[in-house]
C-alpha cells in the first residue's frame, strides 16, 4: 500500500524584512514593520507548528528566514522593543474588552486580547525571547526546512562584479550556520532573481537547490521535459525548482484569490484612526501621529468605502478559512491527478508565497494554513507534502537545463528594481562594490582598528545592496525612508573608504557606525576579495 500518492506538493514561504534598527531613537516607525510581522506572522506560524505537533498531525513546509530577519530576531535591542510593543497592544486589548462590552465589537476585542496573551506566552515561556530556537526545533524534527537568502536580499542580476554575488551568498551561508548549527540546503534568491552562472556560488556553499519563477524554467535550454513540475539541474549540479502559477493565483490574485473574500478582516481600517485621540494616544509613537495599532474591527464587506464596512465576525471568517483550505486541497488533488496522467510520472507542485501574506496582509491566512495541513494529513492520500530536499533524495535523477534570467517581479525581469524612480542608485552602488573589492584585495590580512573599519565598510556595502530600497522607491511606499537609508549607507561607506585610504581613521565615528549598523557581527571583509570569489567559482 506504500507510495500510492500520485504526486507531491512543496509549500514554500519566504520570510523577509529589510534590516531596520535605530538605536539612536527611543522608538522608530519603520521598526514596527518587524514587530507587526512578529505578532501577525512569525509567532502565529510557530503556534500552528506547536499545535499540529502536539496533536500528532504531520506537516511539511519550507521557509526562508533571511539573514536580515535572523539578525533582527536575535538582536537584544529589538527584542526589548518588541516586548514593549506587544505589552502595549495587550494593554489596549484589555481596555477594549471593557469598552466594547454589549456591542458588535466585543468578540473581536476578546479575540485580540487572547491573541496578544498567546504572543506573550509563546515569546516568553516557549522561546524565552529567542524565536529562532523555535524554528530550529521544528527543523530538527524534520517538519520544517529553513532555507537562507542573499545576505541582505541583494538583487544579484544587477551586480556587475561577481565578488558582490559571492559576498551575498557566502555571508548568508555563514550567518545561517551561526543561527541554525548546520549549512543551508536551499536558498531563496532575492526576488527569485536568477542570473545564469550565479549558481556556481551556491554550489560553493553546499547549497543544493533554489527557486525560480515559472518562465525561468520554461525558457531554459534545452526545453524542460516536465515544465515546472519536476526540478532541473543547472550545469553546476544545483537544482532549480519552478513556481506553479495555478496554486499561486488561487491565493495571490487580487480579484479571484481567497484573501479578497468579503468575510475576511479589512486590512486598511485600524483602531489607530477610529478611536478618540486622547484614548489611543498612549499606544502611538512619541510623535503622537495616528498610526496602525494592528487591531482592526471591520471586515472587507465588499467594494464599499472604508466608513461603510461591516463589523468583523471572527467565527464566520474562520469558517471561511476552513472552507478555502478544503478547496485548495481539492484543487491540488485534481491538479496532481491530471499532471500524473499527462506527464506519466509523479509531479511536484511548488507553491511559493511571501510568508507575511499569511497573518499580516491576510489575517486569516494562518488559520487557512492550519486547516490545510490538517486536511492534507487526515482527508486525502493523493498528494504527499515534501520539502525540496526530500524530493531530491527520492528522485535524484533530473534533466540538466540552463535556466534563463528571470525574477518574480512585475513583467518577470528587472523593471521593478531598475527604472526611473531608482536608477540613480546604481552608479553609487557599483562604485562602492568596486572600492570594497579594492580594499579587500589591498589588505589581505588587516588587524586591529583597520580590520574593524574594513568589516564596517563591508556591512555598509551589503546594507546598501538590499533590493528593498529600490522596491520601495518603485512602489512609492516609504520612499523617503528607503532613499535616506541608501544615501546614509553610501555616505558611511565613502567616509570610511577615504579614511582608510588616507590612513586617518576616526575611531569615534567607526564606533558609532558599529553601534548603528551592527548586522553580521561575524563579518569578515575578505568575503569581497577577488581571490575568494575565484576560488568559489572554481569549486
What are these regions (language model features)?
Residues 2-5, 50-58, 130-147, 166, ...:
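Acidic (Asp/Glu)-rich catalytic clusters
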Residues 2-60, 65-107, 118, 222-539:
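Active-site and substrate-binding clefts of carbohydrate-active enzymes
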Residues 165-189, 331-343, 347-352:
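CE4/NodB-like, metal-dependent polysaccharide N-deacetylase domain
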Residues 35-48, 125-130, 167-172:
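Aromatic- and glycine-enriched glycan-recognition loops and surfaces
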Residues 193, 198-207:
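Hydrophobic, small-residue-rich alpha-helical packing segments that form membrane-like cores
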Residues 208-220, 386:
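His/Asp/Glu-enriched short active-site or ligand-binding loop at hydrolase and phosphoryl-transfer sites
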Residues 77, 81-140, 146-159:
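Active-site-proximal, glycine-rich beta->alpha crossover segments in alpha/beta enzymes
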Amino acid at each position: 500500500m506504500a507510495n500510492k500518492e500520485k504526486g507531491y506538493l512543496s509549500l514554500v514561504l519566504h520570510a523577509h524584512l529589510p534590516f531596520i534598527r535605530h538605536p539612536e531613537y527611543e522608538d522608530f516607525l519603520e521598526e514596527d514593520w518587524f514587530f507587526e510581522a512578529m505578532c501577525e506572522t512569525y509567532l502565529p506560524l510557530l503556534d500552528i507548528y506547536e499545535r499540529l505537533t502536539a496533536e500528532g498531525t504531520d506537516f511539511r513546509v519550507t521557509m526562508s528566514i533571511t539573514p536580515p530577519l535572523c539578525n533582527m530576531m536575535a538582536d537584544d535591542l529589538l527584542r526589548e522593543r518588541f516586548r514593549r510593543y506587544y505589552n502595549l497592544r495587550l494593554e489596549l486589548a484589555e481596555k477594549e474588552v471593557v469598552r466594547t462590552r454589549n456591542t458588535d465589537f466585543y468578540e473581536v476585542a476578546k479575540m485580540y486580547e487572547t491573541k496578544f496573551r498567546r504572543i506573550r506566552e509563546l515569546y516568553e515561556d516557549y522561546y524565552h525571547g529567542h524565536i529562532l530556537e523555535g524554528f530550529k526545533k521544528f527543523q530538527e524534527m524534520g517538519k520544517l526546512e529553513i532555507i537562507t537568502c542573499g545576505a541582505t536580499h541583494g538583487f544579484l542580476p544587477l551586480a556587475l562584479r561577481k565578488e558582490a554575488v559571492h559576498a551575498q551568498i557566502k555571508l548568508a551561508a555563514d550567518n545561517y550556520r551561526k543561527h541554525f548549527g548546520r549549512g543551508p540546503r536551499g536558498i531563496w534568491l532575492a526576488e527569485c532573481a536568477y542570473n545564469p552562472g550565479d549558481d556556481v556560488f551556491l554550489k560553493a556553499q553546499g547549497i543544493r537547490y533554489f527557486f525560480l519563477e515559472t518562465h525561468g524554467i520554461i525558457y531554459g535550454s534545452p526545453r524542460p521535459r516536465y515544465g515546472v513540475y519536476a526540478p532541473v539541474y543547472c550545469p553546476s549540479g544545483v537544482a532549480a525548482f519552478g513556481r506553479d502559477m495555478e496554486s499561486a493565483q488561487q491565493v495571490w490574485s487580487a480579484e479571484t484569490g481567497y484573501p479578497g473574500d468579503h468575510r475576511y478582516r479589512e486590512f486598511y481600517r485600524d483602531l489607530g484612526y477610529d478611536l478618540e485621540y486622547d484614548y489611543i494616544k498612549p499606544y502611538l509613537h512619541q510623535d503622537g501621529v495616528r498610526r496602525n495599532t494592528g487591531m482592526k474591527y471591520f471586515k472587507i464587506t465588499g467594494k464599499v468605502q472604508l466608513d461603510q464596512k461591516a463589523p468583523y465576525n471572527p467565527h464566520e471568517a474562520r469558517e471561511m478559512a476552513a472552507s478555502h483550505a478544503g478547496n485548495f486541497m481539492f484543487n491540488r488533488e485534481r491538479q496532481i491527478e491530471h499532471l500524473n496522467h499527462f506527464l506519466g510520472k509523479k509531479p511536484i507542485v511548488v507553491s511559493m508565497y511571501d510568508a507575511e501574506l499569511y497573518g499580516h496582509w491576510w489575517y486569516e491566512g494562518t488559520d487557512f494554513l492550519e486547516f490545510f495541513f490538517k486536511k492534507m494529513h487526515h482527508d486525502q492520500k493523493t498528494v504527499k507534502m515534501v520539502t525540496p530536499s526530500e524530493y531530491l533524495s527520492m528522485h535524484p535523477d533530473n534533466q540538466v537545463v540552463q535556466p534563463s534570467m528571470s525574477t518574480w517581479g512585475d513583467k518577470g525581469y528587472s523593471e521593478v528594481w531598475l527604472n526611473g524612480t531608482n536608477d540613480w542608485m546604481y552608479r553609487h552602488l557599483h562604485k562602492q562594490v568596486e572600492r570594497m573589492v579594492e580594499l579587500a584585495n589591498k589588505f589581505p590580512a588587516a588587524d586591529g582598528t583597520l580590520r574593524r573599519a574594513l568589516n564596517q565598510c563591508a556591512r555598509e556595502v551589503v546594507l546598501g545592496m538590499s533590493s528593498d530600497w529600490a522596491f520601495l522607491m518603485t512602489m512609492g511606499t516609504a520612499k523617503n525612508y528607503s532613499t535616506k537609508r541608501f544615501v546614509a549607507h553610501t555616505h558611511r561607506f565613502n567616509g570610511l573608504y577615504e579614511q582608510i585610504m588616507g590612513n586617518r581613521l576616526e575611531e569615534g565615528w567607526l564606533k558609532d557606525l558599529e553601534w548603528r549598523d551592527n548586522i553580521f557581527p561575524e563579518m569578515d571583509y575578505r568575503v569581497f576579495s577577488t581571490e575568494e570569489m575565484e576560488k568559489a567559482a572554481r569549486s
